């Protein structure tokens, strides 16, 4: 109907007004959805006052100035139709109608086609998937005509990959079954419309997220408490995106945001948790949790905190002697649970053999005196039938694999006094002696001395003094007569009880004679083997005197020998003898009382002139480690002077070094620049006119070569050792001179002061008195060779009588006084070559008087 009507109108207008012509530019139009387009309606002709109108495809007249479809009258001859943001409903034939003043009309039409351009409606990027799941990549395409969709990856059609995991679904989505991390990348969704040759594509980024995996480097971590120690727990995590880490302790989160938390420190990625100043409270199960958008996983770490043992409880105890029992207790903490042991300063109780052992652990000593019970962290030590010797310090030690701790406790035992000391004490008239009464008591005891029932000291016994110390009382007696020898009583009293002990002061005697066992003669010497005197006289032997002479001589030669050195081997050596000569020798012993009986003479004959005895060798390694000083100790010369020593040496399994010849007076040989860490042997032979001695053999090993080597650039590298020593000596002497001059002018002392006093007669600052050691025995160096005894005078003891403080004696005070007698005698032999050199003999002060310890030798 519409077309017929339009045709009639057209014929009408053509027939009536051929002069009006209407054109629309463009004559046709295609618009894509969403695009805009305008059309111009132009009128040609002479008509005036024309009206130009636009009509929509549904025949409605379009109003001017609408929002989306706009009509604008430009002038009398044109009008514009504009379609903004076209949609499918806007398609159709639009008509431009021109009406003249006389009512005639002319029109033109334009067919507007609107199509949907190929577009991607729902194709987000990126699209993320979890590894292992079936991924569907979304790509919705809209167009007027159904498009053809092609999926590409890395420039290739995914279908051509022949990977069965890749499927294009009916809705043109791409499905990837069991997507992998390697499938990640850019996928292109490409649409094509063959009819229009239209093509469009969208690149979609596919991200494959990998669930985290986490593993603890150590599932169990050990630490030690209370050492200021830090421990680090580490978890290694993997996944995509990179997982974030968090930690829990026994299920409670450990926050990573507290800046003032000095206990827990996290690394930058929180994969490491450091626990500072570990203590027992830190022992727990720690869980590290790795989390990302694909999931989470955790791992557990058990922190085991061990603790060194610590003694937590001890208690001192007090008991009475003979009390039935007392128990000492020791408690300790630690992990692992410590074992507790007991000891004193003199015995290790826990390591002693036990008579029994039961559980709970109970150990009893063989004598049944001590019982140790242990259970868990507590141990007790029970002492039965308490003795005073049980008093003192007890140490309990707690030990485990981490360490140990010890704590002391004290057992106080109260007991009546107990007295000890040498019962028999030897001395002689005029010689001071100490009678020692050792006292063991708790509480402290009061000590008294008695003689024949009379309390000492008293006016009847002016030659007696008493010195007291916390552990002993000393009765100093200077016998004046036989009446001073005899019994003395020491009595100690405390609130527990009392105890007395009788001492006997015995008059000492000179020693009996030593017995000569045998004489080993050589050409010019003889070794005399002897036994000590059966009776020492109550005091120790100080020296031995050997006398000898050749048969036919009247006078005896003599020499003194120190008792300590002689008693070590029981041998004295006589020197300066003639070869092939018969001699007699005898011995006597000297103690503080005087020279004892002389032994019977023993005859012997020296050997003829012969080769010398081999020297005795002693080695002393040098500080550098590869040098040695070999000392040559001369033995018997065989009756003929030694001419020289022959020395040869070598490293074992090596060639001998050139022989060294030493003068007869040499007492050592230095071997230098030896091989490091090598074993050497040395042979030394003594030679006289009769021949060579047997070789003395000595073996030694040098040190390993040191690793540190001194720098060549040392300032002293160019100086010899002797030059360096000389420089040091000169510097030292100069310092001494400066110090001596300073002391002379400032303090009136020093070497210059000594010269001034002795040569110039100037009085020294110390000339007001002299020092004298109390009870010190010595032998003079003058011609008389008589023993001299220095004793304290009454004037020296005056301060003590005036109430001054007594000097506390020790084991060397007071000292004994030997009887006056010859110490060394020497005759003038007929032969000048046998003349012995004078010998100086000195006694050892602290050996002058001793109590008799073995009464069988009296």
Swiss-Prot record:
<feature type="disulfide bond">
    <location>
        <begin position="437"/>
        <end position="490"/>
    </location>
</feature>
<dbReference type="GO" id="GO:0042734">
    <property type="term" value="C:presynaptic membrane"/>
</dbReference>
<dbReference type="GO" id="GO:0048666">
    <property type="term" value="P:neuron development"/>
</dbReference>
<dbReference type="GO" id="GO:0072375">
    <property type="term" value="P:medium-term memory"/>
</dbReference>
<feature type="glycosylation site" description="N-linked (GlcNAc...) asparagine">
    <location>
        <position position="316"/>
    </location>
</feature>
<feature type="domain" description="Fibronectin type-III 1">
    <location>
        <begin position="510"/>
        <end position="609"/>
    </location>
</feature>
<dbReference type="GO" id="GO:0016338">
    <property type="term" value="P:calcium-independent cell-cell adhesion via plasma membrane cell-adhesion molecules"/>
</dbReference>
<dbReference type="GO" id="GO:0033555">
    <property type="term" value="P:multicellular organismal response to stress"/>
</dbReference>
<dbReference type="GO" id="GO:0031100">
    <property type="term" value="P:animal organ regeneration"/>
</dbReference>
<keyword id="KW-0677">Repeat</keyword>
<comment type="function">
    <text>This protein is a cell adhesion molecule involved in neuron-neuron adhesion, neurite fasciculation, outgrowth of neurites, etc.</text>
</comment>
<dbReference type="GO" id="GO:0071219">
    <property type="term" value="P:cellular response to molecule of bacterial origin"/>
</dbReference>
<dbReference type="GO" id="GO:0042220">
    <property type="term" value="P:response to cocaine"/>
</dbReference>
<dbReference type="GO" id="GO:0060045">
    <property type="term" value="P:positive regulation of cardiac muscle cell proliferation"/>
</dbReference>
<feature type="region of interest" description="Disordered">
    <location>
        <begin position="765"/>
        <end position="858"/>
    </location>
</feature>
<keyword id="KW-0812">Transmembrane</keyword>
<dbReference type="GO" id="GO:0005737">
    <property type="term" value="C:cytoplasm"/>
</dbReference>
<feature type="topological domain" description="Cytoplasmic">
    <location>
        <begin position="740"/>
        <end position="858"/>
    </location>
</feature>
<dbReference type="GO" id="GO:0034109">
    <property type="term" value="P:homotypic cell-cell adhesion"/>
</dbReference>
<keyword id="KW-0358">Heparin-binding</keyword>
<feature type="glycosylation site" description="N-linked (GlcNAc...) asparagine">
    <location>
        <position position="489"/>
    </location>
</feature>
<keyword id="KW-1003">Cell membrane</keyword>
<dbReference type="GO" id="GO:0005886">
    <property type="term" value="C:plasma membrane"/>
</dbReference>
<dbReference type="GO" id="GO:0005911">
    <property type="term" value="C:cell-cell junction"/>
</dbReference>
<feature type="glycosylation site" description="N-linked (GlcNAc...) asparagine">
    <location>
        <position position="434"/>
    </location>
</feature>
<feature type="binding site">
    <location>
        <begin position="152"/>
        <end position="156"/>
    </location>
    <ligand>
        <name>heparin</name>
    </ligand>
</feature>
<feature type="disulfide bond">
    <location>
        <begin position="139"/>
        <end position="189"/>
    </location>
</feature>
<dbReference type="GO" id="GO:0031175">
    <property type="term" value="P:neuron projection development"/>
</dbReference>
<dbReference type="GO" id="GO:0008092">
    <property type="term" value="F:cytoskeletal protein binding"/>
</dbReference>
<keyword id="KW-0325">Glycoprotein</keyword>
<dbReference type="GO" id="GO:0001837">
    <property type="term" value="P:epithelial to mesenchymal transition"/>
</dbReference>
<feature type="glycosylation site" description="N-linked (GlcNAc...) asparagine">
    <location>
        <position position="348"/>
    </location>
</feature>
<comment type="subunit">
    <text>Interacts with MDK. Found in a complex with SLC39A6, SLC39A10 and with NCAM1; this complex controls NCAM1 phosphorylation and integration into focal adhesion complexes during epithelial-tomesenchymal transition. Interacts with synaptic plasticity regulator PANTS.</text>
</comment>
<dbReference type="GO" id="GO:0043025">
    <property type="term" value="C:neuronal cell body"/>
</dbReference>
<feature type="disulfide bond">
    <location>
        <begin position="330"/>
        <end position="396"/>
    </location>
</feature>
<feature type="binding site">
    <location>
        <begin position="161"/>
        <end position="165"/>
    </location>
    <ligand>
        <name>heparin</name>
    </ligand>
</feature>
<dbReference type="InterPro" id="IPR009138">
    <property type="entry name" value="Neural_cell_adh"/>
</dbReference>
<dbReference type="GO" id="GO:0008201">
    <property type="term" value="F:heparin binding"/>
</dbReference>
<dbReference type="InterPro" id="IPR007110">
    <property type="entry name" value="Ig-like_dom"/>
</dbReference>
<keyword id="KW-0130">Cell adhesion</keyword>
<dbReference type="GO" id="GO:0006979">
    <property type="term" value="P:response to oxidative stress"/>
</dbReference>
<dbReference type="GO" id="GO:0009897">
    <property type="term" value="C:external side of plasma membrane"/>
</dbReference>
